[in-house]
Amino acid sequence: MIIKGTSVFCEDGTFQVKDVFVEDHKIVATEAEVSDKTVVDANGYKLIPGLVDVHSHGACGHDFCDCDVEGVKEILRFEKAHGITSYCPTSMTLSKEMLVDIFATAKEADGIADG
């Protein structure tokens, strides 16, 4: 896919208008020539890398401390819908046994959330 004319956040901290070539859901080049790939007109939009949420207790009424895989999936769908591509589940001050369960649940849900 080619994303045409989007304002790309660059390494120097500026936005520059570029065409972006995406393959297998990853940016592989900028200023790519238009080909027979799908073209998305992104004129007037900004393109930034996926964001990392380094402190998340949960979302949508769910908390990582609930040890509920379906709840964690809902949290991940919410985060993905808001540009978050990586996260660090944050717990409360709890027993070691409870923390093991919390992070095992997060690991089980990781990569399987729809959305």
Which sequence ranges carry the predicted segments?
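Charged helix-capping and loop-helix junction motifs
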Residues: 68-71, 102-107
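Short, intrinsically disordered, charge-balanced linker/junction segments flanking boundaries
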Residues: 106-115
